[in-house]
């Protein structure tokens, strides 16, 4: 079957970007245009000859526009197989004329539910019924019908029509049809997630639909022999994308490992959004230094002093605009990526002198809600993001001694960081600065040893520090080792069958200890 010449088009769009120019071109090629509601008005106001869909159906739009395109003369005109004699006869007998092109985009359901004050009724009214039905009918009959859901495709269709005798190619029609089913799948996923949330359904659904759309290509993955890319993801809770949150201002393309480190660094710095100046230094997704101080430069100096070797080639995130004093301090070493919510005047000029350094602007906070997906050889693990954080008033003091105000501030600082470190985690903190980071060890005792060793390597005195453990101390030995190092207060989830032994050891060493009741394993 040859490519069918486009003679009749049905146009009904919520996003009217480019639609007037598109239809003006169609009309100039002799295409008959039918439309609905606001789209029809926009075309007629622009002087384009377009007729109401009611001309085809013989039926008015009713029920506040809920019913206008759900009609056999519409779907028969879309679904009829053009070279099928029975279909042709049925069309003649029922007064159905073929529709060759459909340009439809859907009611903005996702944008509607993203509004903070949206009502359930408003959300429901933004569920498109006729649009998806027309799109799916047209896409099914892609051998004969061209279907457009994206204004970016208008030019492609027009160019092909001009060079192909008023028709599009089969390849283009198939490509556009595939976009339809991707769109309607994502659309229905968003509606299903919203309905489930409105009904109070919690936990992962029995079936989940996730749309991935390539956003960035990458030279390779974690290692040069692995191919990779970054994909926008829509899991029904809205689309998550790098470009919506970040903007690379300088430097070569970001790698797979860079993306992991950016996620890790900004995940920690988000904990201190709105607080006093804070700096996070990350290497291989684990923090090697985190600190708060009255100035950003002082916070950076403190974070750097935790580990004076690891920051080379590392990733640094700031919770305040990067100022010149801090930029000069950072410029003393090579760092691979700097991430900030803004860069003060002159800072970019200074930092851009090192061409291998990437500078990244964080335009908005990271989304906290949603699901986390981890691929395994035997399936996809799905869990709710670990976004819950214990408040100071929720801490349970289990020792005879209460933590002082200063200890409590350090304990909360440590707990915000500990949950972002690979388990097993032991973290020493003093004066809102990491003093020793023990990460990713199979034994909690080994993590503690590493943390103490790292502190001693740079001459940081643990006397008067606090310690955080991402999971409970299974025995008193870990706590006793911390006490021996000079710790005065402890924060941990609790929950061990030997909690009493650990509490007794804390009391015996005059330690203040609080339980969070919330474990933060990170694998």
Curated annotation (Swiss-Prot):
<comment type="pathway">
    <text>Purine metabolism; IMP biosynthesis via de novo pathway; 5-formamido-1-(5-phospho-D-ribosyl)imidazole-4-carboxamide from 5-amino-1-(5-phospho-D-ribosyl)imidazole-4-carboxamide (10-formyl THF route): step 1/1.</text>
</comment>
<dbReference type="InterPro" id="IPR024051">
    <property type="entry name" value="AICAR_Tfase_dup_dom_sf"/>
</dbReference>
<comment type="similarity">
    <text>Belongs to the PurH family.</text>
</comment>
<dbReference type="Pfam" id="PF01808">
    <property type="entry name" value="AICARFT_IMPCHas"/>
</dbReference>
<dbReference type="InterPro" id="IPR036914">
    <property type="entry name" value="MGS-like_dom_sf"/>
</dbReference>
<dbReference type="InterPro" id="IPR016193">
    <property type="entry name" value="Cytidine_deaminase-like"/>
</dbReference>
<protein>
    <recommendedName>
        <fullName>Bifunctional purine biosynthesis protein PurH</fullName>
        <ecNumber>2.1.2.3</ecNumber>
        <ecNumber>3.5.4.10</ecNumber>
    </recommendedName>
</protein>
<dbReference type="GO" id="GO:0006189">
    <property type="term" value="P:'de novo' IMP biosynthetic process"/>
</dbReference>
<comment type="pathway">
    <text>Purine metabolism; IMP biosynthesis via de novo pathway; IMP from 5-formamido-1-(5-phospho-D-ribosyl)imidazole-4-carboxamide: step 1/1.</text>
</comment>
<dbReference type="InterPro" id="IPR011607">
    <property type="entry name" value="MGS-like_dom"/>
</dbReference>
<dbReference type="GO" id="GO:0005829">
    <property type="term" value="C:cytosol"/>
</dbReference>
<dbReference type="GO" id="GO:0004643">
    <property type="term" value="F:phosphoribosylaminoimidazolecarboxamide formyltransferase activity"/>
</dbReference>
<keyword id="KW-0808">Transferase</keyword>
<keyword id="KW-0511">Multifunctional enzyme</keyword>
<keyword id="KW-0658">Purine biosynthesis</keyword>
<keyword id="KW-0378">Hydrolase</keyword>
<dbReference type="GO" id="GO:0003937">
    <property type="term" value="F:IMP cyclohydrolase activity"/>
</dbReference>
<dbReference type="InterPro" id="IPR002695">
    <property type="entry name" value="PurH-like"/>
</dbReference>
<dbReference type="Pfam" id="PF02142">
    <property type="entry name" value="MGS"/>
</dbReference>
<feature type="domain" description="MGS-like">
    <location>
        <begin position="1"/>
        <end position="149"/>
    </location>
</feature>
């Amino acid at each position: 079957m040859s490519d069918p010449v486009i003679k009749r088009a049905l146009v009904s769009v919520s996003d009217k970007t480019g639609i007037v120019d598109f239809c003006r071109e169609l009309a100039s090629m002799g295409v008959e245009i039918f439309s609905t509601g606001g789209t029809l008005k926009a075309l007629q106001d622009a002087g384009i000859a377009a007729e109401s869909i009611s001309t085809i159906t013989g039926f008015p739009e009713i029920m506040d526009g809920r019913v206008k395109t759900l009609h056999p003369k519409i779907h028969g005109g879309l679904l009829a197989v053009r070279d099928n004699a029975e279909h042709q006869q049925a069309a003649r007998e029922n007064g159905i004329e073929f529709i060759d092109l459909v340009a439809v985009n859907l009611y903005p359901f996702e944008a509607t539910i993203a509004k903070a004050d949206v009502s359930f009724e408003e959300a429901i009214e933004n569920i498109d019924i006729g649009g998806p039905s027309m799109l799916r009918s047209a896409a099914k009959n892609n051998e004969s019908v061209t279907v457009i859901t994206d204004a970016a495709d208008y030019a492609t269709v027009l160019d092909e029509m001009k060079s192909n005798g008023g028709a599009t190619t089969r390849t283009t029609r198939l490509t556009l049809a595939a976009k339809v089913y991707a769109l309607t799948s994502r659309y229905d996923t968003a509606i299903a997630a919203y309905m489930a949330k409105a009904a109070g359904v919690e936990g992962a659904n029995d079936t989940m639909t996730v749309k991935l759309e390539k956003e960035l290509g990458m030279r390779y993955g974690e290692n040069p022999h692995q191919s990779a890319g970054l994909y926008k993801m829509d899991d029904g809770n809205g689309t998550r994308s790098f470009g919506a949150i970040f903007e690379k201002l300088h430097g070569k393309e970001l790698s797979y490992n860079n993306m992991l480190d950016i996620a890790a660094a900004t995940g920690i710095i988000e904990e201190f959004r709105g607080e006093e100046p804070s700096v996070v230094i990350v290497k291989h997704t684990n923090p090697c230094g985190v600190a708060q101080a009255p100035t950003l430069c002082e916070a950076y100096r403190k974070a750097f002093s935790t580990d004076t070797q690891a920051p080379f080639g590392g990733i640094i995130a700031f919770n305040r605009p990067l100022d010149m004093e801090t930029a000069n301090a950072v410029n003393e070493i090579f760092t691979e990526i700097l991430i900030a919510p803004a860069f003060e005047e002159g800072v970019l000029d200074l930092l851009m002198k090192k061409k291998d350094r990437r500078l990244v602007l964080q335009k908005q906070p990271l989304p906290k809600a949603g699901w986390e997906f981890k691929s395994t050889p035997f399936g996809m693990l799905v869990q709710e993001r670990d976004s819950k954080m214990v408040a100071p008033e929720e801490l349970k003091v289990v020792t005879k001694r209460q933590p002082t105000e200063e200890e409590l501030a350090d304990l909360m600082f440590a707990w915000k960081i500990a949950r972002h470190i690979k388990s097993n985690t032991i973290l020493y903190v003093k004066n809102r600065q990491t003093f020793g980071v023990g990460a990713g060890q199979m034994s909690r005792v080994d993590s503690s040893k590493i943390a103490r060793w790292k502190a001693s390597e740079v001459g940081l005195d643990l006397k008067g520090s606090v310690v955080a453990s991402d999971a409970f101390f299974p025995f008193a030995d870990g706590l006793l080792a911390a006490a021996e190092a000079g710790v005065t207060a402890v924060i941990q989830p609790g929950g061990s069958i030997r909690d009493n032994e650990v509490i007794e050891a804390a009391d015996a060493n005059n330690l203040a200890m609080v339980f969070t009741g919330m474990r933060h394993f990170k694998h």
